[in-house]
């Protein structure tokens, strides 16, 4: 008899498939009457998501979103499953009824995870804070208590820092906390500027953070929306965005792109930390806002050591896929 060894990376897709089947199967087959599935049936399915294997390959976190069709709401909790034990080992980690726990992320040593939740938000607001929990259970501990809540977060690759984005919409900035003092340390603000941070990611060496930021904040648009004038303006003039990097040791910030014909929309860093690729959308008013399908966007390659930029594509009314 032959046995095959399945690695954690290979087990992850299989576990996800089983979890999807588990979410769909909500009652014993013997108690169900066979009939065509309806649109409402689909809407009432519990949905798994946010699959996050631990770095040591032992566990996987995931979320289950349970809809309430009549109230037009859904509620999300976090679950944990052993990569070796499979579905029978799955257990629920959070148990709120009216609040949501989402976006679980493991610490680099797999000893705990952090997630976002609105469990302690005022009734009139829906802002997320960050919480700490160990895989063996216990009550979650609150990490942040920031006025505007946390938009997103990520651990540094060396596991020493937890960074998060927070602030008023359009003015969000980046902050970091030391992992060895999450509950008592004051967060360091690592970016500042008149416009908020959009997409961002840690550098592989954990010494810097790359991010996209608009050149300025559109105050006219802010005032319009504050006055409840929310009619969309066709082909509105909007700020361009560029790629930046902040060096955490020197606390210096450097702009990496300033192309006259491209506004940066998203980017990726190479695994060796030598390169960045980014998408540059057209800066022409009637090309950049006419569609969200990236018909006038191109791929660029940035050498980080020299800051030399090479344009890789010449698109015109052609949308690219990932």
Description of each model-found segment:
Residues 57-60, 110-113, 159-162, 209, ...:
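Hydrophobic beta-strand positions that form the internal "hydrophobic ladder"
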Residues 14-26:
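Bacterial N-terminal signal peptides
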Residues 64-78, 94-101, 114-131, 139, ...:
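A flexible loop/linker signature enriched in serine peptidases of the S9 family
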């Amino acid at each position: 008899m032959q046995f095959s060894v399945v690695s954690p990376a290979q087990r992850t897709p299989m576990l996800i498939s089983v979890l999807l089947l588990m979410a769909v199967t909500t009652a014993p087959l013997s108690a169900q009457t066979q009939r065509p599935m309806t649109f409402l049936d689909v809407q009432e399915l519990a949905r798994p998501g946010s699959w996050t294997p631990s770095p040591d390959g032992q566990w996987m976190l995931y979320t289950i979103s349970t809809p309430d069709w009549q109230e037009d709401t859904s509620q999300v909790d976090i679950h944990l499953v052993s990569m070796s034990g499979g579905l029978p080992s799955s257990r629920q980690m959070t148990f709120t009824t009216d609040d949501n726990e989402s976006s679980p992320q493991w610490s680099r040593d797999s000893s705990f995870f952090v997630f976002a939740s609105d469990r302690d938000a005022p009734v009139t607001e829906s802002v997320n804070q960050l919480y700490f929990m160990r895989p063996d259970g216990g009550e979650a501990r609150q990490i942040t208590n920031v006025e505007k809540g946390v938009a997103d977060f990520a651990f540094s690759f060396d596991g020493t820092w937890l960074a998060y984005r927070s602030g008023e919409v359009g003015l969000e900035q980046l902050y970091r906390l030391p992992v060895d003092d999450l509950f008592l340390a004051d967060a360091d603000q690592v970016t500042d500027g008149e416009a908020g941070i959009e997409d961002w990611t840690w550098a592989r060496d954990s010494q810097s953070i790359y991010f996209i930021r608009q050149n300025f904040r559109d105050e006219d648009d802010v005032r319009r929306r504050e006055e409840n004038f929310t009619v969309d303006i066709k082909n509105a003039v909007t700020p361009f965005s560029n790629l930046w990097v902040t060096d955490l040791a020197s606390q210096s910030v450097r702009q990496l792109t300033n192309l006259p014909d491209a506004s940066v929309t998203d980017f990726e860093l190479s695994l060796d930390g030598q390169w960045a690729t980014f998408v540059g959308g057209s800066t022409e008013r009637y090309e950049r806002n006419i569609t969200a399908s990236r018909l006038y966007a191109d791929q660029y390659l940035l050498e980080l050591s020299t800051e030399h930029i090479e344009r890789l594509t010449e698109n015109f009314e052609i949308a690219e896929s990932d």
